[in-house]
């Protein structure tokens, strides 16, 4: 019974780690999407000076920061991933200042300055670094997930063996009881 319980616990733990990896991948993609929506809204705000676009920019940028916080929390047990998230946090801090300058100009209806700052931000090398960091996070987590899938399959096989052994022992005990 203890063998069966331990095999079941190992399998449950493996499934939990798989779910954790999928969550990290999902949060990374959600962060990327929120950043893209924020930058698109800022572009519209810089050109059209519509306050609603400015609000969408602020909301999406804030959402991206929430995803970043979740990501920091979820990778803290993995030094390699935590280091990537730290670099990403630093890059996004600088990016936020850059985009904030463009948003401020748009807020004060300085169209030329807003467009110019937004355009400069669009050509900044930080975009490539941020994209690379996001891709690295996902690639690393997929590697971790593949290993976790292998462990889960092994744990599932161990659980099946324990169930089979437990069933055979139960059948043998029943036969002995009937024969006696």
Name each model feature, range by range.
Residues 1-36, 74-92, 155-159:
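Amphipathic alpha-helical segments and their boundaries
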Residues 5-11, 45, 102, 171, ...:
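Transmembrane helix-loop junctions and nearby membrane-interface residues
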């Amino acid at each position: 019974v203890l063998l069966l319980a331990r095999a079941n616990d190992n399998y449950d733990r493996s499934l939990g780690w798989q779910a954790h990896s999928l969550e990290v991948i999902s949060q990374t993609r959600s962060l990327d999407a929120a950043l893209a929506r924020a930058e698109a809204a800022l572009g519209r705000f810089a050109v059209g000076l519509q306050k609603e676009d400015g609000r969408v920019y602020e909301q999406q940028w804030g959402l991206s920061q929430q995803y970043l916080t979740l990501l920091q929390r979820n990778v803290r047990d993995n030094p390699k991933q935590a280091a990537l998230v730290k670099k990403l946090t630093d890059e996004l801090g600088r990016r936020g200042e850059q985009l904030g300058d463009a948003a401020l100009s748009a807020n004060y209806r300085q169209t030329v300055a807003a467009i110019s700052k937004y355009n400069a931000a669009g050509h900044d090398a930080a975009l490539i670094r941020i994209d690379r960091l996001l891709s690295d996070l996902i690639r690393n987590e997929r590697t971790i997930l593949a290993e976790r899938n292998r462990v889960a399959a092994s744990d599932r096989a161990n659980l099946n063996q324990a169930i089979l052994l437990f069933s055979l022992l139960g059948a043998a005990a029943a036969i002995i009881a009937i024969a006696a």
